[in-house]
Each structure stands twice: as structure tokens, then as C-alpha cells.
């Protein structure tokens, strides 16, 4: 193995995927939205950040934070923009925020190491500001609990479905990421001993593209194949608003993920 290959392997970090659930007071939604959008916009500028998305359902905000390694995640919490967000939103929340940790299934850990959120840059090297509300994308999170004995088969079938989704003829599927839940000792229970929890983070160009996806043959086939593998009925949350990114082009995959999709296909 060449020395360059060895260095590449050494540079691959364990990607940290965290979903943070924040619940705003009824009258604080607008302020929470602006503060969270500002924090996300600054967070994607961090060198070792892969994604920082923010979604809203009613008064619940879900932050999807993906960092390249534990050190990058720790450094994020020391950033002035994070500290300002933390201070500014504390009084807006109706209850303490909670977090969930995941490991990547698709794209892979290696792919996430080579991906950053794409930015729109002008000729002067400045980030182009996009008007809030100009995007049309819709997002949903699907939670699926799978019997442990079926996890390998479930992941294979689901990755095939994700790749087919990204290749849909109308190009309406902007993201189809698959994460596997990491439970802490406090979370462990008998159910978790017998099953694993997965989350599909799906983003579509608009509601029509989402409907088109649900009616595709590959989506219907996926449902039929995985139904016997599920420990309980799947659940999902359809978000009311994509808080960030405001520019739909920023949902795009980096080159590494596109290559992975082609190889897997």
C-alpha cells in the first residue's frame, strides 16, 4: 500500500451525527427560527462540518448536525456563534433540548469525511445570501425499528432504495440519508436489546416530487420487503418548514457521495 493511501486512511474520522430536538415556546417560534438559521449558516463554515440542517414541525425544531470526528464536534461547541445561539435561545425553549446520536449507513462514514455543504459564492469570494422562503424543498424523517437478526438485509435493501430514489427520473429527491441510532446506557431497554432503530432523512424538491417518490415501484418494493423485518410500525415526521438551508442547491451531495452512488448502483 502506498504511503499516500495510508495517509488517506489515517485521515478518515468517525463521523459524529447528532439530532438535537428543541421545543420553542408558542410565542417564540419566529425568534427561534432566526437564531437557529444564523447559527446553522455559521456552522457550515466550520472546516470539519459536513452538514448542519435545521427543520421545524409546529414548535419543534430538529437540528441535523454532522461533524467529521469528535474533536470537530467539541470545537463547534467552543465557537462564538454556537455560544451566542445557546445563550439567545435558552429563554425561548419550553423544555430542555434533547439529543440523539447516530452512525452513518448511507452515505458511508468515508463518504461523509469528504463532503461539505456546497456554498454559493460570488466573483469576490463572498457567500451569496438567499432570500428566506425562496426554497421549495420539503423534508421528512422516517423512524424504523428493525429486528437485529434482519439488520444486514434491511440495510442492503434500504441502500438500494436510497440509490434508486436519488436516481429518480424527475430528479426530485435531493437527499436520502440513512442513519443508525446509537443508544446510550440510559436509553438501553429490552426493546433495544432485540432491535435496532434507523432514521431516513429524506428531502424532496417539492411536495409533488415527494408524492412521485412514494408512488415509485422501488419505494413500493422496499415497503413490501422490509415489512416483515420491522419490530413495530414505522413512524415519521413531516416538517412544516426547512429553516436551513434556505438555498435548495445546498442540499446537493459532494462528489464523493455521487461516486459512491454510482459504484453501489
For each feature predicted by the language model, list its residue ranges.
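Flexible, substrate/cofactor-facing loop regions flanked by secondary structure
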Residues: 125-165
Amino acid at each position: 500500500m502506498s504511503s499516500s493511501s495510508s495517509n488517506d486512511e489515517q485521515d478518515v474520522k468517525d463521523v459524529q451525527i447528532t439530532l438535537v430536538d428543541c421545543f420553542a415556546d408558542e410565542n417564540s417560534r419566529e425568534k427561534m427560527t432566526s437564531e437557529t438559521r444564523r447559527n446553522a449558516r455559521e456552522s457550515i463554515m466550520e472546516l470539519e462540518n459536513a452538514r448542519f440542517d435545521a427543520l421545524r414541525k409546529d414548535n419543534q425544531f430538529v437540528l441535523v448536525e454532522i461533524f467529521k470526528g469528535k474533536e470537530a464536534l467539541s470545537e463547534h461547541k467552543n465557537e462564538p456563534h454556537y455560544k451566542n445561539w445557546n445563550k439567545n435561545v435558552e429563554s425561548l425553549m419550553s423544555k430542555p433540548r434533547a439529543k440523539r446520536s447516530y452512525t452513518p449507513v448511507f452515505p458511508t462514514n468515508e463518504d461523509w469525511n469528504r463532503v461539505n455543504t456546497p456554498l454559493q459564492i460570488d466573483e469576490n469570494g463572498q457567500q451569496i445570501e438567499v432570500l428566506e422562503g425562496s426554497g421549495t424543498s420539503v423534508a421528512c424523517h422516517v423512524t424504523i425499528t428493525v429486528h437485529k437478526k434482519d439488520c444486514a438485509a434491511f440495510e442492503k435493501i434500504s441502500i438500494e432504495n436510497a440509490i434508486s430514489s436519488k436516481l429518480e427520473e424527475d430528479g426530485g429527491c435531493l437527499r436520502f440519508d440513512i442513519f443508525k441510532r446509537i443508544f446510550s446506557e440510559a436509553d438501553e431497554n429490552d426493546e433495544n436489546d432485540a432491535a435496532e432503530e434507523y432514521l431516513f432523512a429524506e428531502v424532496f424538491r417539492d411536495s409533488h416530487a415527494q408524492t412521485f417518490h412514494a408512488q415509485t415501484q422501488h419505494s413500493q418494493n422496499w415497503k413490501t420487503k422490509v415489512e416483515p423485518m420491522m419490530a413495530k410500525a414505522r413512524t415519521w415526521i413531516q416538517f412544516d418548514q426547512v429553516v436551513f438551508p434556505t438555498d435548495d442547491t445546498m442540499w446537493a451531495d459532494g462528489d464523493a457521495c455521487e461516486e459512491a452512488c454510482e459504484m453501489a448502483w
